[in-house]
């Protein structure tokens, strides 16, 4: 039986620890340069269709579907190498590894992310994030629907969830209530999206960047005053 922890930290990957918007920009630029704008736009349309269908962006799946449309295009094979060999470690947000180290000093720390079964694990491994949390990694299709499994694997009296998506933070808060402290790093596409911010409950803690969490001690993070509350409210207006 797994022992109950006092506190467990659950940390998202894309646009929380890793600048996924930058990665997407690099993929788009590579496609345009190597295969042309039409290829880039068609690939991205397939990628977005898969996002709607699956709930996460399946980069390799989109490439395979594009290949079905262009079965004679052998040049596409180089795109898979670009994706698999991408230097993810270069896209870590400043201080992200230090934040994970700080969390690990306080309690078990787990990467909690969504994604496919090939590209997402590769991203987590090559970025150095898996090593930073001693391979404590959970990759789901919809993590907000897998909370029972998370609790079985990492039972705790209290959880801290760090995620750039207000929707995820709100869903987990609704499920776990006061047993979870939700932390919103204002990074990525949702950072200043007034419509999204207005649609979901305010997180317990809001910071401008993941590295700002180094300024917190455990008591302040979990039970102390919530900074940036006024700024979050202003974004919602």
Regions found by a protein language model. Name each.
Residues 1-5, 125-161, 165-237:
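Asp-based, Mg2+/Mn2+-dependent phosphohydrolase catalytic module
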Residues 10-12, 112, 161-162, 207:
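Generic enzyme active-site microenvironment
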Residues 16, 23, 117-118, 167, ...:
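Conserved Rossmann-like nucleotide-cofactor binding loop
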């Amino acid at each position: 039986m797994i022992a109950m922890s006092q506190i467990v930290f659950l940390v998202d990957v894309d646009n929380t620890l890793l600048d996924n918007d930058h990665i997407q920009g690099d993929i788009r630029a590579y496609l345009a340069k190597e295969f042309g704008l039409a290829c880039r736009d068609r690939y991205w349309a397939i990628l977005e269709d898969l996002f709607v269908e699956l709930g996460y962006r399946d980069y390799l799946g989109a490439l395979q579907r594009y290949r079905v449309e262009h079965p004679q295009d052998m040049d596409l094979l180089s795109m898979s190498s670009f994706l698999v060999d991408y230097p993810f470690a270069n896209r870590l947000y400043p201080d992200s590894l230090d934040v994970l180290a700080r969390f690990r000093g306080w309690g078990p720390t787990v990467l909690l992310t969504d994604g496919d079964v090939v590209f997402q694990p590769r991203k987590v491994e090559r970025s150095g994030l898996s090593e930073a949390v001693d391979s404590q990694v959970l990759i789901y299709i919809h993590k907000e629907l897998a909370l029972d499994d998370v609790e079985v694997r990492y039972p705790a009296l209290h959880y801290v969830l760090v995620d750039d998506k207000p929707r995820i933070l709100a869903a987990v808060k609704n499920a776990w209530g006061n047993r979870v402290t939700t932390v919103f790093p204002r990074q990525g596409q949702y950072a200043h999206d007034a419509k999204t911010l207005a649609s979901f409950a305010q997180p317990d803690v809001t910071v401008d960047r993941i590295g700002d969490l180094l300024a917190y001690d455990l008591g302040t993070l979990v039970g102390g005053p919530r900074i940036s509350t006024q700024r979050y409210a202003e974004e919602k207006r």
